[in-house]
Each structure stands twice: as C-alpha cells, then as structure tokens.
C-alpha cells in the first residue's frame, strides 16, 4: 500500500513540475516584450541621448542646433521626476540591412499629456511630425491607449527620432522599437 501511495505522490509531483514549467515558459514570453525589440531582431543599430529642459522654454530648433546640450546615455539612465520640465529624447537609428524595415516606435506611457515625435533624416531635416498623448485630439482609441508611430527606414540608411515629453505627473516613458510584425504579435 505504501508503494502505491508513493507512486501516486511521485506522479503528482511530476505533473506539478510540468505545469510550473509550462507556466514559467509562457510567463517569460509574455512579461518580457523587449525580447522582440528591433535591435534584437534586425540589423538596426541604435544610439541614445537626452536633454532635460527644466525651464520648459527650449524649442525644437534650439535643441537640434545645440548638440552639446545632449547627454549621451541610454534612456534607462534618464533621471525621471515629477517636476515640471520637458524631456527631449534622441534616438538615432541606422539600418545596416539590405532590406527596408517597417518600424513601430512604442511609447510605454499612456498617461503622457503631450508627446511630440519629430522624425529627421540623416541631415537633420524634418521628415514628419507626430503628436500623441491623452490631451491630443483626433487620435484613435488604440493610439490613446498604446501610444505609437509607424514609419519606414530604408535599407542602408539612418534616421533620427526626437521625442518631446511634456506632461504633468508621471513622465517616465520607455521607448521600444519593433518591426511591424512583432508589434502586432505583442
């Protein structure tokens, strides 16, 4: 009788371990969306910089024409705070692939008031401006809840995204770049 009970307990433990393995595998794939960012799935090279405008007086032209103001550090090093200040994030993208890349920039803060994204070519000429944020009108429900932009990076070319974050409250806005397919799959 004890052997039979021991056998049932061993089978129950094996099933429990198998279930925990499946749950941990699924959870690790769902919890870490940065695993699928473009710098890990395509030959796209990224360079980061930022500037904190404590006076909220700097304009786009001022920031672009004074590159010495920038701090060249990853966005994870930005000293985010609740103070009334503008954050200017610079993201240089270089597509070293022989294929063009459809890119989605996801701004992971649905509570940001005003988020302006300037897309520049390699000569710092403005290509397009995007306005996102919960104070902006004429956005789709998806753009309100998941702030993002879509754009194309041609093969063997580079672009720059300049992101201005102007908000009251939580200003921390992680920026993740995905290929279009991976963004849809997430």
Predicted regions and their residues:
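Bacterial N-terminal signal peptides
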Residues: 13-22
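Soluble non-transmembrane domains of integral membrane proteins
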Residues: 27-186
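Bacterial N-terminal signal peptides that target proteins for export
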Residues: 2-13
């Amino acid at each position: 009788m004890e052997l039979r009970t021991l056998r049932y307990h061993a089978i129950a433990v094996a099933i429990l371990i198998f279930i925990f393995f499946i749950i941990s595998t699924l959870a690790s794939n769902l919890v870490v969306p940065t695993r699928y960012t473009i710098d890990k799935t395509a030959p796209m090279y990224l360079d980061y910089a930022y500037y904190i405008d404590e006076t909220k007086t700097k304009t786009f032209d001022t920031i672009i024409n004074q590159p010495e103001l920038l701090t060249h550090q990853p966005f994870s090093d930005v000293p985010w705070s609740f103070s009334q200040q503008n954050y200017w994030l610079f993201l240089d993208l270089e597509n070293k692939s022989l294929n063009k890349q459809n890119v989605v920039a996801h701004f992971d803060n649905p509570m940001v008031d005003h988020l302006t994204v300037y897309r520049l070519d390699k000569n710092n000429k403005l290509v397009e401006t995007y306005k996102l944020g919960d104070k902006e009108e004429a956005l789709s429900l998806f753009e309100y809840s998941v702030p993002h932009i879509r754009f194309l990076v041609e093969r063997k070319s580079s672009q720059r995204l300049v992101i201005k974050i102007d908000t009251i409250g939580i200003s921390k806005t992680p920026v993740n770049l995905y290929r279009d397919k991976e963004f849809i799959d997430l």
